[in-house]
């Protein structure tokens, strides 16, 4: 965390350790807390107590007059931490924080996916992004083929990928949970060939996808590469993100199971575990993306085929 200068700096620096112990990423509040520190230093340099007035002043975006849910979630966590250690601190009520609305992700057609991966395979070499001509086709196939979160794919270390046994180890992902993800034989073969080429280029590298010695690719690089491929594919899915590939893995898996006549209610927990969901409901949400396709199979007439999503 960059240099902090407000009176809250010691607490802001200590809070990530507490959140990590609860299974949260130490990075998830970093940007917001750094911004809060600057706000306090600039506008409330003498303040030593997280009061209701201070918390609401920061949560209110003065430029737009709107209430920031992102800021309120962060300062709520700071208030909880302060009270936990016996300090005075206002906890922003959860009722003040609007729940984010979840838009429907783009569902790629087979033709769009073929065009997308044709675009990934057409990316040429560039001295500014060494090895991208191999990394881009493989990392996006991995996200789609194994349903990984984009950060999970970026952060893979070389020892996490066991191509011989077609297994990928995801370490300390969301809420610091670990899991092992089986992959198809074709995908395992692709990962093995990529690893061999990358090892010839940079023996003993740390990251499976390594941008520079000892450095993984950045989120911005992955997003920019994804959008470039969408554009090269004819401008498909302009509002989508790399996460859209993960969503498509889930929906295509569900469709395959439905067409095979499997009981989705019984199989959804397996999908949830495979994709690293702590709860059942996120996986069940994917069922609601497929009403027309499921109806076409005739399976929606079976009682209980679409479980209720309560959260």
Features from the language model and the residues they span:
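Conserved catalytic core of the tyrosine transesterase superfamily
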Residues: 1-311
């Amino acid at each position: 965390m960059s240099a902090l200068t407000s009176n809250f700096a010691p607490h802001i620096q200590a809070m990530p350790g507490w959140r990590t112990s609860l299974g949260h990423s130490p990075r998830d509040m970093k940007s917001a807390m750094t911004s809060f520190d600057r706000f306090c230093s600039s506008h409330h340099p003498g303040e030593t107590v997280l009061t209701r007035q201070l918390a609401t002043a920061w949560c209110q975006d003065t430029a737009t007059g709107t209430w920031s849910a992102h800021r309120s979630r962060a300062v709520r966590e700071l208030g909880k931490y302060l009270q936990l250690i016996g300090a005075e601190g206002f906890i922003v009520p959860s009722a003040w924080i609007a729940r984010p609305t979840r838009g429907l992700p783009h569902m790629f057609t087979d033709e769009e996916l073929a065009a997308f991966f044709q675009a990934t395979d057409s990316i040429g070499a560039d001295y500014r992004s060494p090895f991208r001509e191999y990394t881009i086709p493989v990392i996006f196939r991995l996200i789609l083929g194994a349903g990984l979160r984009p950060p999970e794919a970026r952060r893979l270390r070389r020892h996490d990928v066991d191509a011989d046994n077609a297994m990928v180890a995801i370490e300390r992902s969301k809420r610091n949970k670990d899991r092992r993800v089986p992959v198809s034989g074709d995908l395992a073969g692709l990962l093995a060939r990529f690893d061999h080429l990358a090892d010839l280029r940079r023996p003993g590298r740390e990251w499976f996808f390594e941008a520079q010695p000892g450095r993984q690719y950045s989120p911005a690089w992955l997003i920019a590469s994804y959008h470039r491929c969408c554009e090269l594919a004819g401008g498909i899915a302009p509002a989508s993100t790399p996460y859209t590939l993960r969503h498509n893995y889930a929906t295509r898996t569900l469709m395959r199971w439905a067409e095979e006549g499997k009981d989705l209610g019984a199989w959804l927990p397996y999908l949830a575990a495979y994709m690293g969901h702590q709860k059942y409901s996120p996986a069940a949400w994917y069922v609601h993306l497929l009403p027309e396709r499921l109806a076409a199979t005739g399976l929606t007439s079976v009682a209980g085929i679409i479980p209720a999503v309560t959260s």
